[in-house]
């Protein structure tokens, strides 16, 4: 649990950001005369306010607290302490706040700007611009961040395929248009890169609206994403909402609701499909645990808040599609200590349609995207949705890779030559399948020098079927690594064989006497030398 005093965030960066929030804080609601109060206690981000007369502000109502020489502080009511006092949580740094400071109830919850005015902009939890663009107009339309999910009768089930162009996802864990998908993984396995690639792919493929919620992540990553989107030309149809890790827990806790309010506006008022991306939902849970501790609630399992399940459900149930417009959510979920039984992870997993599990072992082998083909799953992998051929290939791919994993201990102890002929053949195909399911990403092109590839589902199925059939048994494994379609791999294999032939011809021409043999062969595709027989049937 973070030290409450550490949430004040009185650094220069916070002060500069909040100086730009002045106009937005004054617009969160229409202040009422009878809503005047005064601060009676300040404990880090927790502010107790007394109201001498009139009704108390409602739960989740926004309060504004002017501060001498600084921007007004925005707080949200979370508890009624008595007939004349409430406990509120500040969404900004409380440095400079004193007992006795005047407080004004706004008459409603936090309201954030929506509509075309926010497209291409970076916003804070209160809707204040955080980029170098112009201030939002005073008459821009605003919506409250707190609202219920659409009635069940109006919701539309998610049963249409949402193609991403990423082979391993489309084949083994297909996403649903209007559904929820989560990328589960520990630190450093590629969750954020995968989310950024999905943003790039979705904007190019579907030309819809994208809303990105950066929840408790690094400021550096948020800045890089803003620059990358500007450079790729997709920022114009995207809204970025950030609550970075240096901000108080209340701000990080409410960022998903701000992003949802914007997405719901485009869904309900404009009838537009929306791609909602959240990175990282675990930080939402973590911020909720901090808030729970600050408000004096007893912790539950592993130190989480006792309201963990209800908070996650309230967020996830608002992500819904209606007739004529869909909200498709893709969420990155950090798995602490790679423990998939963590209460936060299991609470989030209960609400998603597709689970994409990123594996540290796959990342260590260089298999990017490091998606575990066996652990990942989707409710859409059904013959009635994706077709019999798709399901048959997906099941066989999983079976072959899983059987290969069962044999890895035997191979490590005795060597692959001790396996039977059928098992050796299966191991070779499993390794080729693993490499074929890797893929270069457009967002990493600047670092790898390799152009990104987007692959149609039909090409992915055809490629996997050919490998399972044995059409590629005599190919180098490296020819299937980091390619798009099987045709790309075929060209890579042909080029490698041609290079081998030229090398052998040159070696033969340079030898004066009888040819000598070498204990190693060179893999031209990977540029590495390895002992003969170590290729497992390349």
Curated annotation (Swiss-Prot):
Start-end of Low complexity biased regions: 506-529
Binding sites annotated in the UniProt record for ATP: 185-192
Location relative to the cell: Cell inner membrane
Secretion signal, residue range per the UniProt entry: none
UniProt keywords, alphabetically: ATP synthesis, ATP-binding, Cell inner membrane, Cell membrane, CF(1), Hydrogen ion transport, Ion transport, Membrane, Nucleotide-binding, Translocase, Transport
Residue ranges with Polar residues bias: 1-10
E.C. no: 7.1.2.2
Entries under SUPFAM superfamilies matching the protein: C-terminal domain of alpha and beta subunits of F1 ATP synthase, N-terminal domain of alpha and beta subunits of F1 ATP synthase, P-loop containing nucleoside triphosphate hydrolases
Bias-annotated ranges (Basic and acidic residues): 494-505
One of the Pfam families matching this protein, by short name: ATP-synt_ab_N
Cellular component terms (Gene Ontology): plasma membrane; proton-transporting ATP synthase complex
MF (Gene Ontology): ATP binding; ATP hydrolysis activity; proton-transporting ATP synthase activity, rotational mechanism
Mode of membrane association: Peripheral membrane protein
Domain of life: Bacteria
Family designation: Belongs to the ATPase alpha/beta chains family.
Assembly with partners or alone: F-type ATPases have 2 components, CF(1) - the catalytic core - and CF(0) - the membrane proton channel. CF(1) has five subunits: alpha(3), beta(3), gamma(1), delta(1), epsilon(1). CF(0) has three main subunits: a(1), b(2) and c(9-12). The alpha and beta chains form an alternating ring which encloses part of the gamma chain. CF(1) is attached to CF(0) by a central stalk formed by the gamma and epsilon chains, while a peripheral stalk is formed by the delta and b chains.
Function of the molecule: Produces ATP from ADP in the presence of a proton gradient across the membrane. The catalytic sites are hosted primarily by the beta subunits.
Full protein name: ATP synthase subunit beta 2
């Amino acid at each position: 649990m973070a030290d409450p005093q550490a949430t004040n965030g009185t650094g220069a960066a916070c002060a500069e950001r909040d100086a730009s929030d002045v106009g937005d804080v004054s617009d969160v609601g229409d202040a009422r005369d009878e809503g005047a109060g005064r601060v009676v206690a300040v404990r880090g981000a927790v502010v107790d306010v007394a109201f001498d007369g009139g009704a108390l502000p409602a739960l989740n109502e926004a309060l504004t607290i002017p501060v001498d020489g600084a921007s007004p502080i925005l707080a949200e009511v979370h508890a009624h302490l008595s007939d004349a006092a409430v406990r509120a949580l500040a969404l900004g740094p409380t440095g400079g706040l004193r007992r006795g400071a005047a407080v004004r109830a706004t008459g409603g919850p936090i309201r954030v700007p929506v509509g075309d005015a926010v497209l291409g902009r970076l916003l804070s939890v209160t809707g204040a611009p955080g980029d170098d663009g112009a201030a939002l107009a005073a008459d821009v339309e605003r919506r409250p961040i707190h609202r219920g999910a659409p009635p069940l009768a109006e919701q539309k089930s998610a049963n249409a395929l949402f193609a991403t162009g990423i082979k391993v996802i489309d084949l083994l864990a297909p996403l649903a248009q209007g559904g929820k998908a989560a990328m589960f993984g520990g630190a450093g396995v590629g969750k954020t890169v995968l989310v950024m690639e999905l943003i790039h792919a979705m904007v190019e493929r579907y030309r819809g609206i994208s809303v990105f919620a950066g929840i408790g992540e690094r400021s550096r990553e948020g800045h890089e994403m803003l620059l990358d989107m500007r450079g790729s030309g997709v920022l114009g149809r995207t809204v970025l909402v950030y609550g970075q890790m240096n901000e108080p827990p209340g701000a990080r806790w409410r960022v998903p609701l701000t992003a949802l309010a914007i997405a719901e506006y485009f869904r309900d008022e404009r009838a537009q499909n929306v791609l909602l991306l959240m990175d990282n939902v675990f930080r939402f849970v973590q911020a909720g645990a901090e808030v729970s501790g600050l408000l004096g609630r007893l912790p539950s399992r592993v130190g989480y808040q006792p309201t963990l399940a209800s908070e996650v459900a309230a967020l996830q149930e608002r992500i819904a599609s209606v007739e004529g417009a869909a909200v498709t959510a893709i969420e990155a979920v950090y798995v602490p200590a790679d423990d998939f039984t963590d209460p936060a992870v299991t609470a989030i997993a209960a609400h998603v349609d597709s689970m994409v599990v990123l594996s540290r072992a796959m990342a260590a082998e260089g298999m990017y995207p490091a998606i575990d083909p066996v652990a990942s799953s989707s409710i859409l992998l059904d013959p009635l949705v994706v077709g019999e051929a798709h399901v048959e290939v997906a099941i066989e791919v999983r079976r072959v890779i899983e059987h290969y994993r069962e044999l890895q201990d035997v191979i490590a102890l005795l060597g692959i030559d001790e396996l039977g002929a059928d098992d050796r053949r299966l191991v070779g195909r499993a390794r080729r399948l693993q490499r074929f399911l890797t893929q270069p990403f457009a967002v990493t092109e600047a670092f790898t020098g390799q152009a990104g590839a987007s692959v149609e589902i039909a090409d992915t199925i055809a490629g996997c079927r050919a490998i399972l059939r044995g059409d590629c048994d005599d190919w180098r494994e490296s020819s299937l690594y980091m390619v798009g379609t099987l045709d790309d791999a075929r060209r890579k294999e042909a080029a490698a064989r041609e290079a081998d032939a030229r090398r052998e011809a040159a070696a033969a021409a340079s030898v004066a006497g009888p040819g000598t043999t070498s204990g190693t062969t060179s893999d031209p595709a990977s540029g590495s030398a390895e002992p003969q027989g170590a290729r497992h049937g390349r």
